[in-house]
Amino acid sequence: MEVNDKFFAQDDIFWENYLKGRPRVPDSFFDRIFDYHKAKGGHFGTVHDVGAGNGPYALRLRSRFDHVIVSDIVANNIELARRRLQGEEGFSFRTSRLQDADDIAAGSVDMVFATNVMHFADPQDIAMAAIAHQLRPGALFRQGGRQLLNKANDPTETARVMLRTQGTRGIQSMLPLDDVHQTTPEPNYTGPDDAEIYEDDEGWSFETDLAGVKEHFESFPFVSQFPGAFTEMYRELDDLLADGKPVQGYFPVKVILATRS
């Protein structure tokens, strides 16, 4: 397995499961981003959807921007995005790592939209430099298991990716405790003038059943590679959620909004 560039190298069946298993993003999510961008005097010319997969959010971005660049590290994902957006105007497509942006003119992008992708970029400083290169002044940057380590061809890099997903307030890290020694914590870049806001948004709550829980698990690319690792957990879920018992919860979301000076 390649470390980062093959995690989401999946077929259209996976992406169908992905769209079913991941949260239905509420309008409030995009409204917050667009309102912030407008309040900062940003233009709505070009937005770059990086790590876009098969482009599930591209049309929503196009509803406000004149042009959407859809890019992903996996060529097949970009082909799936082309099919998904066939006949639509205002889109261009590129296959590239997030860190590689030399083909994009400096200062030509009004917003970089990075959803569930920044933790894969390594090294992080090169990724941020690539984002800064393409953003015009006043433009917006929006970022919102052990078996995996054993199969990765660079466990140290994969450990850094997993550590960057470590959450707070009860969110469990993906990195096994006895593998933390492989890497060091990422630095905290929160500055004294940055605002951290915690709030509840009902749009991220959900109620589902056993089938819905399994759809969510199957939206992660490594689940299908290690079916045996989930056998016992699925057996427990079958007992807990028998007879259509509902599951209620919410998806925790962290959004970073930053304007290029």
UniProtKB/Swiss-Prot annotation:
Pathway membership: Secondary metabolite biosynthesis
Keyword Metal-binding found: no
Keywords for this protein: Methyltransferase, S-adenosyl-L-methionine, Transferase
Sequence segments annotated as region (Methyltransferase domain): 49-141
Family that this chain belongs to: Belongs to the methyltransferase superfamily.
Record function comment: Methyltransferase; part of the gene cluster that mediates the biosynthesis of the tetrahydroxanthone dimer neosartorin, which exhibits antibacterial activity. The two different monomeric units appear to be synthesized by the same set of enzymes, among which the Baeyer-Villiger monooxygenase nsrF is the key enzyme for the divergence of the biosynthetic routes. The pathway begins with the synthesis of atrochrysone thioester by the polyketide synthase nsrB. The atrochrysone carboxyl ACP thioesterase nsrC then breaks the thioester bond and releases the atrochrysone carboxylic acid from AacuL.
Protein name as it appears in the record: Methyltransferase nsrG
Organism: Aspergillus novofumigatus (strain IBT 16806)
Gene name in the database record: nsrG
